[in-house]
């Protein structure tokens, strides 16, 4: 029993195999010859040789009538990250810098460094960049992580059948 369970579980996780099954497992392997996954849901692919022509015509008719869009994860993550980096650099950059300037600590209208605190000096070489407006590595990491979060949200909601229907 343990050997049958082990071979069945390896069959479920492995791609289609052309090995001949043992005689006592012949019935199980005819039903589950190939197993594919759509997200976390298993898809059973039954391959039967006795009525292949009727099943092919039926499956081709079904395939032609349904249109299913699946999202490519790498494409979604790349586009979402690129879009968020673009928005961070060209749209929200000035707004972000103005809000950061308002939050700098001050004493008597001067920054702590200008008031004489030498340890309050920023570590400048980390934030240096060759970008004309000063988009640095911290901005890239922040906006890139926002893009990844949005992409994973899109992929998670699309894989479980969630349809927001905004319009």
Curated annotation (Swiss-Prot):
<keyword id="KW-0934">Plastid</keyword>
<dbReference type="InterPro" id="IPR000549">
    <property type="entry name" value="PSI_PsaG/PsaK"/>
</dbReference>
<dbReference type="GO" id="GO:0015979">
    <property type="term" value="P:photosynthesis"/>
</dbReference>
<keyword id="KW-1133">Transmembrane helix</keyword>
<dbReference type="Pfam" id="PF01241">
    <property type="entry name" value="PSI_PSAK"/>
</dbReference>
<dbReference type="InterPro" id="IPR023618">
    <property type="entry name" value="PSI_PsaG/PsaK_dom"/>
</dbReference>
<keyword id="KW-0603">Photosystem I</keyword>
<keyword id="KW-0150">Chloroplast</keyword>
<dbReference type="GO" id="GO:0009522">
    <property type="term" value="C:photosystem I"/>
</dbReference>
<dbReference type="InterPro" id="IPR017494">
    <property type="entry name" value="PSI_PsaG"/>
</dbReference>
<dbReference type="InterPro" id="IPR016370">
    <property type="entry name" value="PSI_PsaG/PsaK_pln"/>
</dbReference>
<keyword id="KW-0602">Photosynthesis</keyword>
<comment type="similarity">
    <text>Belongs to the PsaG/PsaK family.</text>
</comment>
<dbReference type="GO" id="GO:0009535">
    <property type="term" value="C:chloroplast thylakoid membrane"/>
</dbReference>
<keyword id="KW-0793">Thylakoid</keyword>
<comment type="function">
    <text>Not yet known.</text>
</comment>
<keyword id="KW-0809">Transit peptide</keyword>
<protein>
    <recommendedName>
        <fullName>Photosystem I reaction center subunit V, chloroplastic</fullName>
    </recommendedName>
</protein>
<keyword id="KW-0812">Transmembrane</keyword>
<feature type="region of interest" description="Disordered">
    <location>
        <begin position="1"/>
        <end position="32"/>
    </location>
</feature>
<feature type="compositionally biased region" description="Low complexity">
    <location>
        <begin position="1"/>
        <end position="31"/>
    </location>
</feature>
<feature type="transit peptide" description="Chloroplast">
    <location>
        <begin position="1"/>
        <end position="69"/>
    </location>
</feature>
<feature type="transmembrane region" description="Helical">
    <location>
        <begin position="137"/>
        <end position="157"/>
    </location>
</feature>
<keyword id="KW-0472">Membrane</keyword>
<feature type="transmembrane region" description="Helical">
    <location>
        <begin position="75"/>
        <end position="95"/>
    </location>
</feature>
